[in-house]
Amino acid sequence: MVKFYDREFGSRLLIGSALYPSPAIMQDSIRESGAEIVTVSLRRETAGGKAGDQFWSLIRELGVTVLPNTAGCRGVRDAVTTAKLARELFATSWIKLEVIADNDTLQPDVVGLVEAAQILIKDGFEVFPYCTEDLSVAMRLVDAGCRVVMPWAAPIGSARGITNRDALKLLRDRLPDITLVVDAGLGAPSHAAEAMELGYDAVLLNTAIAKAEDPVAMARGFKLAIEAGRTGFEAGLMGARDFASPSTPVIGTPFWHAVS
């Protein structure tokens, strides 16, 4: 089980709802992933009108928990306003907080992110902040009241996997009581397994599944990889070595020498 604020979930995979080839494939992919939390963008999905009604109907049919996000917001005021609208629409205090600094890299504006988190937490929100892998930023978010932190592995949609393993490991080591979710930049199931082997509590995926040749099959692949990575972490991974170490010990006399 993984805990997000005061709620527990069985799946360690959070999944996005954008970019799929069709609404039906989106539904099937989410089901196959086993995800219980689905992120939705207030700015990029139409909440009203015929298309919006169809989209929300499909999400409701899945019986999942909706995590609204502030994707596309470029400043503190924009992010805070969007979060408040999301709370009214979805009747939830949860918000995946994104404050973007640059359109080319979609890198988080970490200064604005911390400020927006402080404002929203004081207003009763439970914030899921999308941030870089910088420890000082993560600690400021925790000090602001965030009990979940979501560092990127690489820029959104890049599919590069974990580019700064040491920094992500440091976050896990220094924030043992915080729910940590790798968010953005994963492109293959092996990337998700690596994140879980580092001890991360969950991963959030969208593009890697939605843009696969077979999104439904890829959703299952990520589900299995996350389970495998978490199992490996809990089992206790052996440490890496600089030199070889024999797997079969040499003890006593070879058995063929012992035969008279």
UniProtKB/Swiss-Prot annotation:
Keywords from the UniProt entry: Cytoplasm, Schiff base, Thiamine biosynthesis, Transferase
Any GO molecular function: thiazole synthase activity
GO biological process, one term: thiamine diphosphate biosynthetic process
Residues in the signal sequence: none
EC number assigned by the record: 2.8.1.10
Subunit structure of this chain's protein: Homotetramer. Forms heterodimers with either ThiH or ThiS.
Official protein name in the record: Thiazole synthase
Species of the source: Rhodopseudomonas palustris (strain ATCC BAA-98 / CGA009)
